[in-house]
Amino acid sequence: MKITRKAHPLLKMINHSFIDLPTPPNISSWWNFGSLLGACLALQILTGLFLAMHYTADTTTAFSSVTHICRDVNYGWLIRYLHANGASMFFICLYLHVARGMYYGSYMFLETWNLGVILLLFVMATAFMGYVLPWGQMSFWGATVITNLLSAIPYIGPTLVEWVWGGFSVDKATLTRFFALHFILPFIITALTMVHLLFLHETGSNNPTGLNSDCDKIPFHPYYSMKDLIGLLLLFFFLLLLVLFFPDILGDPDNYTPANPLNTPPHIKPEWYFLFAYAILRSIPNKLGGVLALLLSILILMIIPFIHLSKQRSMSFRPLSQCLFWTLAANLIILTWIGGQPVEHPYITIGQVASILYFTIILILMPLASLIENKILKW
């Protein structure tokens, strides 16, 4: 008689994806982030669902409803801060997941990689709309500034902005539609994640060497299910540390002031995980140029597989590329810092240099380093 997990139509799919899945024996902890992202997504949907039960998407009561959740709902403060800081953990895992893909050449799985970039864009859109919902000062002005960027699109720009707003400014219609979209998008992300996994399991996982490991595989369970569990425990430890001791450390104090269209905050800035892109946007004086640079800062990930000129897939044995990779990582940290600073000297210059460097490293220096490394291989 066949084992149930191998015979049952539904369990069979789960079995092939998470239990008997042939996995390379040498994948490191950098491969944990996929499962951590799944856990973050589940947490966000669950906490978001409970928040939505008490939240009201109306400009007059939105701010009060969030206060009500924190003060009057049983463990409402915990749910709210798990959701807010869970988003930060989500983005930390996302960026590390993408960095792992860049370092070990996982972008050579084209379908998986491109769908991953689309997922990143969806998650960013969802997080942006979620930031608008508490209807504090930074929510309102952040929404105004970012949606206004659409007006840079030639000819249809101004009409498009009013269409997104549902009026002539960010108001009740905007808040209502953002809430509706913020609620539905995570479910679309879940569906896309399943397709992302489907594509990955067509080719099998990459590994730190970048070599084909078809001849040497081990089952996912119990080896990697246990390994993922340790990663999960660490993630929740840091998340709870954040939620229970420093719940507001990553937030903006301005968001504890109700939205006021007549009073502009001195420094309008998005959440910390968008600051690098915001810095790139601000570093270009031209509005349309800034918007294009902002889009390209993420979409550049889709170009990476086509400018991979190295004979080796992974960076494990490529010291020049490794130096450039870590320079890029440091550059992104600088951009994140600059995005949170006021627009004045010397921050403007630092932001412009860091933005130029960001694109130069990816588009010019990395392919160049690959060619030099190819030459060295022949010596």
Swiss-Prot record:
Any single GO BP term: mitochondrial electron transport, ubiquinol to cytochrome c
Species the sequence originates in: Thryonomys swinderianus
Extra facts: Heme 1 (or BL or b562) is low-potential and absorbs at about 562 nm, and heme 2 (or BH or b566) is high-potential and absorbs at about 566 nm.
Known partners and oligomeric status: The cytochrome bc1 complex contains 11 subunits: 3 respiratory subunits (MT-CYB, CYC1 and UQCRFS1), 2 core proteins (UQCRC1 and UQCRC2) and 6 low-molecular weight proteins (UQCRH/QCR6, UQCRB/QCR7, UQCRQ/QCR8, UQCR10/QCR9, UQCR11/QCR10 and a cleavage product of UQCRFS1). This cytochrome bc1 complex then forms a dimer.
PROSITE patterns: CYTB_CTER, CYTB_NTER
Compartments, record wording: Mitochondrion inner membrane
Residues the record lists as binding heme b b562: 83, 182
Keyword hit for Hydrolase: no
Protein name, as recorded: Cytochrome b
Top-level taxon of origin: Eukaryota
